[in-house]
UniProtKB/Swiss-Prot annotation:
S-adenosyl-L-methionine binds at K20, G21, R22, H140, N209, H210, Y261, F262, F263. It comes from Gallus gallus (Chicken). PANTHER family: HISTONE-LYSINE N-METHYLTRANSFERASE SMYD, N-LYSINE METHYLTRANSFERASE SMYD2. This is N-lysine methyltransferase SMYD2. GO terms for cellular component: cytoplasm; cytosol; nucleus. SUPFAM superfamilies: SET domain (SSF82199), TPR-like (SSF48452). Keywords: Chromatin regulator, Cytoplasm, Metal-binding, Methyltransferase, Nucleus, S-adenosyl-L-methionine, Transcription, Transcription regulation, Transferase, Zinc, Zinc-finger. It comes from the Eukaryota. It is found in: Cytoplasm, Cytosol; Nucleus.
């Protein structure tokens, strides 16, 4: 690790952040909405469910994509995108044909295979590594428990199983390190409604440390990551992004950070816990619940969130909706509707309604969610923008033009800061407004 500050082009420098290891620091002032830097993906992989609607190469969303002539499972904008993606796609093309229905490596395995291929094709430093090289990634190997090590060994076995014909592997120890690095430093690419599009490696973006009061936000333009200021940043200030969903109270956020990234956050929000009381709001009753009843309900809420996360993989929508409704009923006896655990289950219920195309049901949940979301999340939150966007599109689908108009404009106002005024998503939403 280089401990001295290394100046970089464009008003930013890598430096040794006290107590945090490496970090990124501003050398000049940045205004809200200003682009600090962009970073092309070192490598990226489109999620299987988005094949056919997004280009496997550049992730552009469009109609009429062309199929790969061999496997017929990858889709591209044109010959250029296909040629550019071939060094990566060839790892999977023949294997998908050979394995047929049995071809099912996880996205992490697919991404890691691409990293190995990229390192072989392009061993020198890339345009994605101006500040931080992939080989410098933290792995936190010493902090992995047996369960995490076992999951990594499963991934290594899958890598050998699905990719053995087209790759040379480093030894097992090196693969353990690489998978641990990917787990801590990989990014998920999402669209404007926060639907999952794929996974990618953005080395320079991974240099930024975490805060629950971030001063920048990361968005994506295809496979390009862009980092914009959501607060004014002064020269000498460290640049912080958020690694996690910021809806939840301090204890939950830090549980998540410890589990995934092996540290506890000491930002202002985690120290002062100013938002926790609102986030855990209790229903005002003549006979208020005891502290023990509240503790028990929080425990129940955390369990039901985990139960639902698992159930999503195998239960039908009707049963998933039932889990949401029953848990909301039970929690509602103690929690206010604006309590984050209530909001979590409402959001899941809204997702089920959208899936089964129950637009009215989805709208009812969304209307309950949006105000508390705006309060609990920081300014210019993608979660708030995507909720306004979903609401706007639902209103439009249900012929409520004035409400749709208003909601879509609220989404645009946030996105112009977070995504930049010229982002294709914003042009698409403006077109939706004109077309209705």
């Amino acid at each position: 690790m280089r401990s001295e500050a290394v100046p970089q082009p464009g008003g930013l420098e890598r430096f040794a952040s006290p107590g945090k290891g490496r970090g990124l620091r501003a050398l000049r002032r940045y205004a809200v909405g200003e682009l600090l830097f962009s970073c092309p993906a070192y490598t990226a992989v489109l999620t299987v469910s988005e094949r056919g609607s997004h280009c496997d190469g550049c992730f552009a969303r469009k109609e009429g994509l062309s199929k790969c002539g061999r496997c017929k499972q990858a889709f591209y904008c044109n010959v250029e995108c296909q040629k550019e993606d071939w060094p990566m796609h060839k790892l999977e093309c023949a294997a998908m044909c050979a394995f047929g229905q049995n071809w099912n490596p996880s996205e992490t395995v697919r991404l890691t295979a691409r990293i190995l291929a990229k390192q072989k094709i392009h061993p020198e430093r890339t345009q994605s590594e101006k500040l931080l090289a992939v080989k410098e990634f933290e792995s936190h190997l010493d902090k992995l428990d047996n369960e995490k090590r076992e999951l990594i060994q499963n991934d290594i076995a899958a890598l050998h199983h699905f990719y053995s014909k087209h790759m040379e592997y480093p030894d097992n120890a090196a693969l353990v390190v690489l998978f641990a690095q990917v787990n801590c430093n990989g990014f998920t690419i999402e669209d404007e409604e926060l639907s999952h599009l794929g996974s990618a490696i953005f080395p320079d973006v991974a240099l930024m440390n975490h805060s629950c009061c971030p001063n920048v936000i990361v968005t994506y333009k295809g496979t390009l990551a862009e980092v914009r200021a959501v607060k004014e940043i002064e020269p000498g200030e460290e640049v912080f992004t958020s690694y996690i969903d910021l809806l939840y109270p301090t204890e939950d956020r830090n549980d998540r950070l410890r589990d995934s990234y092996f540290f506890t956050c000491d930002c202002r929000e985690c120290t002062m816990k100013e938002k926790d009381k609102e986030k855990l709001k209790i229903r005002k009753l003549n006979d208020p619940p005891s502290a023990e009843a509240v503790r028990d309900m929080i425990k129940y809420a955390r369990n039901v969130i985990e139960e639902f996360r698992r159930a999503k993989h195998y239960k039908p929508p009707s049963e998933l909706l039932e889990i949401c409704e029953l848990s909301l009923d039970k929690m509602g006896a103690v929690f206010e509707d604006s309590n984050v655990y209530m909001l979590h289950m409402m959001y899941q219920a809204m997702g089920v309604c959208l899936y089964v195309q129950d637009w009215e049901g989805a709208l009812r949940y969304g209307q309950k969610i949006i105000r508390p979301y705006s309060k609990h999340y920081p300014s210019y939150s993608l979660n708030v923008a995507s909720m306004w966007l979903k609401l706007g599109r639902l209103y439009m689908a249900l012929e409520n033009r004035p409400a749709g108009d208003k909601a879509l404009k609220k989404a645009i106002a946030i996105m112009e800061v977070a995504h930049g005024k010229d982002h294709p998503y914003i042009s698409e939403i403006k077109k939706e407004l004109e077309d209705h």
